[in-house]
Design a protein with these regions (language model features):
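Alpha-helical recognition segments enriched in aromatics with Gly/Pro capping
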Residues: 1-127
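Structural preference for alpha-helix termini/caps and helix-kink/transition segments
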Residues: 67-69, 74-246
């Protein structure tokens, strides 16, 4: 019982003003019993409440289809994964699996997540550039009220389904950008929703803010392409790459 008491005491000492009551308590699904049941019992005896409003029990991480554990010697540190693959692809890989399900970490799954992140940033960068070049102010993050996306998050934090809503919006945005006559209001709507979804998921979409120099470089770059001056367009493209636009 000492282990369970330690957790209750720590929570009570930090959240005493809330009567030792927290909104979300997380942990691996193997802690559901007896640890979390004992925490609840002790907290209820002490404060008269069940300690937490929501309990989230996550699945284990499997490395190449084996449970990650010290005994198997296959432990991978998060800092090493982020250093090698990047934080955003790793986040997307995690979000693409429901938190209660086992998470399979393989070169294939992280590789797919890297490709997915590239698709997201490619679309989001293109959207932000097109809108700015049209003289349209980029909408600020406001907390989306798009029902379908947040319904999925409210449904036991169903991040895989929430990602599906995001990808549907990205598909619509790419289709709108390919139109000969672009509906700029529709495109602005695509941008705003994608930006809200990414913000809610904690994903950096790689938004580009164009300064006056970048706007002028873009104009010269497109003029050079139209004139089929490929040598000049390559030089200008290189400058845009240096500014993080391409």
């Amino acid at each position: 019982p000492g282990w369970h008491t330690e957790c209750c005491v720590m929570i009570d000492s930090i959240f005493r003003e809330q009567n030792g009551y927290i909104d979300i308590h997380g942990g691996g699904f193997d802690l559901k019993f007896p640890h979390h049941e004992n925490e609840m019992a002790q907290a209820e005896a002490h404060n008269g409440n069940r300690l937490a409003h929501y309990w989230l029990h996550n699945g284990f991480i499997n490395i190449d289809n084996e449970k990650m554990s010290k005994s198997l010697g296959n432990v991978i540190l998060a800092k090493d994964v982020i250093a090698r693959y990047g934080g955003m692809p790793f986040r997307l890989m995690v979000l693409n699996t429901h938190y209660r399900a086992p998470l399979s970490f393989t070169e294939e799954t992280i590789g797919e997540a890297m490709k997915t992140y590239q698709k997201i940033t490619s679309c989001f960068k293109s959207l932000s550039i097109k809108l700015q070049r049209q003289g349209i102010d980029l909408p600020q993050i406001k907390g989306s009220d798009e029902e379908e996306f947040f319904d999925e998050l409210c449904n036991d934090l169903n991040t895989p389904n929430a990602l599906s809503v995001l990808f549907s919006e990205i598909k619509a945005a790419n289709q709108n950008m390919r139109q000969k006559e672009i509906d700029w209001e529709a495109l602005k709507g695509n941008y705003g929703r994608i930006r809200d979804y990414l913000f809610a998921l904690g994903v950096d979409g790689g938004e580009v803010k164009l300064d006056q120099e970048a706007m002028e470089l873009f104009r010269e770059y497109e003029d050079a392409k139209k004139a089929k001056d490929f040598e000049k367009s390559d030089v200008l493209r290189g400058k845009l790459v240096e500014k993080g636009v391409f």
